[in-house]
Amino acid sequence: MSASIPDIKLSSGHLMPSIGFGCWKLANATAGEQVYQAIKAGYRLFDGAEDYGNEKEVGDGVKRAIDEGLVKREEIFLTSKLWNNYHDPKNVETALNKTLADLKVDYVDLFLIHFPIAFKFVPIEEKYPPGFYCGDGNNFVYEDVPILETWKALEKLVAAGKIKSIGVSNFPGALLLDLLRGATIKPAVLQVEHHPYLQQPKLIEFAQKAGVTITAYSSFGPQSFVEMNQGRALNTPTLFAHDTIKAIAAKYNKTPAEVLLRWAAQRGIAVIPKSNLPERLVQNRSFNTFDLTKEDFEEIAKLDIGLRFNDPWDWDNIPIFV
């Protein structure tokens, strides 16, 4: 999709850029301009979600670039994610239609189940995005919807032409295995938290052997969660200042961010970093201009402590990763 960014061929047959622009926490006031500038900088994959609450603005940025002739729709790869309140098969298309309307497109390139958790349905007109709201104050209310039922609804939307590829996010290996057994269309992508503090080699090996492409979020470790004042992140040394990462970066005359992205890429993993700085956008794209050595990988492997920053156990003791 971009001459300077390698593509990954998904099991669905579609091509996905190996690096994209993450839209989590993009402010509504600036999201449209940031997406537009990222397109000008050569980015073609935009990773969003219903829950991020900024799909209208992301759509504005994409539409502006298309209207100005910078890109065609088919050159842009749009990812969105089905939020927890819409897992019931009768509500899946309702949620997707809202995403399509906000993004101002008639299909998304990739649609993921955001979490393997089903909350009570909340009508769009009542609250959107609902976040953790389940229609009962601050209480979590769950629905008994098996993942495979939600998946079958997504498969129908692929057949309808509203989605090109489908996948999952924040799934452990056992749930992914169960889904692979029952799916007619196999999940094309598994998006997970992935950084040197949480390397998940067994999950990645299993998924890749099954033909499922891995996309990493939070490639810079605690960075995004420090901005949210999360305790675990605040008490964790930043990877940008870690001696191991700094030493490798100095060896190649690269930034720590480039090293972290290249480390993931050499594991066959797509990445979706975000930056507010134009020069960083360009820097991050250069992640494929150098190679880490076996020794570099061995040093980074020593940083793995199984430290997860995005854990639904923190929400309501939801046992996805226990």
Curated annotation (Swiss-Prot):
Report if keyword NAD is assigned. yes
Pathway involvement?
Carbohydrate metabolism; D-xylose degradation
Give one Pfam family. Aldo_ket_red
Which GO terms are recorded in the biological process aspect for this UniProt protein? D-xylose catabolic process
Return the PANTHER family for the record: ALDO/KETO REDUCTASE
Q: Do the record's keywords include Nucleotide-binding? A: no
Q: Where is this site: Lowers pKa of active site Tyr?
A: K81
Under SUPFAM superfamilies, the record lists: NAD(P)-linked oxidoreductase (SSF51430)
What keywords is this UniProt entry annotated with?
Carbohydrate metabolism, NAD, NADP, Oxidoreductase, Xylose metabolism
Similarity annotation: Belongs to the aldo/keto reductase family.
User: Could you tell me which InterPro entries the record lists for this protein?
Assistant: AKR, AKR2B1, Aldo/ket_reductase_CS, NADP_OxRdtase_dom, NADP_OxRdtase_dom_sf
Q: What is its EC number?
A: 1.1.1.307
* Residues at which substrate binds: H114
Q: How does it assemble?
A: Homodimer.
The record lists the catalysed reaction(s) as: xylitol + NAD(+) = D-xylose + NADH + H(+); xylitol + NADP(+) = D-xylose + NADPH + H(+)
Q: Name one GO molecular function term.
A: D-xylose reductase (NADPH) activity
> Where, by residue number, does NAD(+) bind?
169-170, 218-227, 274-284
Question: What organism is listed for this UniProt entry?
Answer: Candida tenuis (Yeast)
Indicate what this protein is called per its UniProt record.
NAD(P)H-dependent D-xylose reductase
Q: Which residues form the active site?
A: Y52 (proton donor)
